[in-house]
Design a protein with these regions (language model features):
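Active-site histidine-anchored catalytic micro-motif
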Residues: 1-79, 83-84
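Alpha-helical segments flanking ligand/cofactor-binding loops in enzyme cores
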Residues: 22, 90-91
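Conserved SGNH/GDSL esterase-like catalytic core that processes O-acyl groups on lipids
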Residues: 87
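ATP/pyrophosphate-binding catalytic subdomain of soluble kinases
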Residues: 94
């Protein structure tokens, strides 16, 4: 990267992206890492980039499923992303 004149690598992403950024930093590349995760599981933050969008998408899907479940007298379950955190399930359930 230095041969190409890259002074710094700016990365925005989740665990995988930041792990790769760490590997570049260990090889001497200047790296700025910006955490972005829909899981909302980063310490010292109230809300992470992507979390509100995830809630909007899940809430819309739940609204549509609710109508179908109600008209057919069914109970439906919805699995959402979140890895080891349950924030998306909690917030979308409240919404």
């Amino acid at each position: 990267m230095k041969k190409e004149g890259v002074d710094v690598l700016v990365v925005i992403g989740g665990d995988g992206t930041l792990t790769s950024a760490r590997d570049f930093a260990r090889k001497g590349v200047n790296v700025i890492g910006v955490p972005k995760t829909i899981d909302n599981d980063l310490a010292s933050t109230d809300v992470t980039f992507g979390f509100n969008t995830a809630i909007d998408v899940v809430t819309e899907a739940l609204d549509r499923l609710h109508t179908t479940a109600e008209s057919h007298h069914r109970i439906m379950l919805c699995e959402v992303m979140g890895r080891n955190a349950g924030w998306i399930a909690l917030e979308s359930g409240i919404a």
